[in-house]
Swiss-Prot record:
Family classification: Belongs to the Maf family. YceF subfamily.
CDD domains reported in the protein's UniProt record: Maf (cd00555)
Gene source species: Vibrio cholerae serotype O1 (strain ATCC 39315 / El Tor Inaba N16961)
Cofactor: a divalent metal cation
Protein's UniProt name: 7-methyl-GTP pyrophosphatase
Main function: Nucleoside triphosphate pyrophosphatase that hydrolyzes 7-methyl-GTP (m(7)GTP). May have a dual role in cell division arrest and in preventing the incorporation of modified nucleotides into cellular nucleic acids.
InterPro entries (alphabetical): ITPase-like_fam, Maf-like
Alphabetized SUPFAM superfamilies for the sequence: ITPase-like
Statement: the UniProt record of this protein carries the keyword Hydrolase: yes
Record's keyword terms, sorted: Cytoplasm, Hydrolase, Nucleotide metabolism
Gene Ontology CC: one annotated term: cytoplasm
GO molecular function: nucleoside triphosphate diphosphatase activity
Pfam families listed in its UniProt record: Maf (PF02545)
């Protein structure tokens, strides 16, 4: 097994915290790629394309294994982005009230030695409880989820917004599906345990 530098193609502190759970040394790099969706592109295709483009844009040394990841949430077949403002966050939460929304997380692992990329898309469904406007406002004021797809942080107080969760890996909901990442790393000969 070659000694690869592990690179996380993300500046997200949430993804960094998740990856740190694996107890593997890694560095981070800011990806440089156009995130504009293509006309008619499905969420799955968009996220796999973006994850791969991010990973391929960030290798820092030879040899490197570069992790790229991207995420969106979808409600009623519409991609919901990061709210960026308090009003937009409250609006998103009220739209999601009583609904099931699906999170799509694209994951890519690029080996710069072989130029091969493993790419996949993981899904996770969140069932929201019925929310009043005052509940949504109190939550947004308390946690400021303005840079989070779906306007919540499931790893914090956001858990109070849900009736139930459906998915294989709760880390996927935060933006980095570790169970699947471990499989991709092992495919490259890097064993986590």
């Amino acid at each position: 097994m070659q000694n690869y530098q592990l690179v996380l193609a993300s500046t997200s502190p949430f993804r960094q915290q998740i990856l740190a759970k694996l107890k593997l040394p890694f560095v981070t790099a800011k990806p440089d790629c156009d995130e504009t969706p293509l006309i008619g592109e499905t969420p799955e295709h968009l996220l796999m394309r973006l994850a791969e483009n991010k990973a391929r844009s960030c290798f820092l040394a030879d040899p490197s294994l570069v992790i790229g990841s991207d995420q969106v949430c979808v409600i009623d077949d519409q991609i919901i982005g990061k709210p960026l403002t308090t009003e937009k966050a409250v609006e998103q939460l009220l739209r999601q009230s009583g609904q099931a929304i699906t999170f799509y997380t694209g994951l890519a692992l690029f080996n710069n030695q072989t130029q091969q990329t493993q790419v996949l898309c993981d899904t996770f469904t969140v069932h929201f409880r019925t929310l009043s406007e005052s509940m949504a406002r109190r939550y947004v004021e308390a946690e400021q989820p303005l840079h989070c797809a779906g306007s919540f942080k499931s790893e914090g107080l956001g858990i109070a917004l849900f009736e139930r969760l459906e998915g294989d890996d709760p880390n996927s909901l935060i933006g980095l599906p570790l169970i699947k990442l471990i499989q991709l790393l092992e495919n490259e000969g890097l064993n986590v345990i």
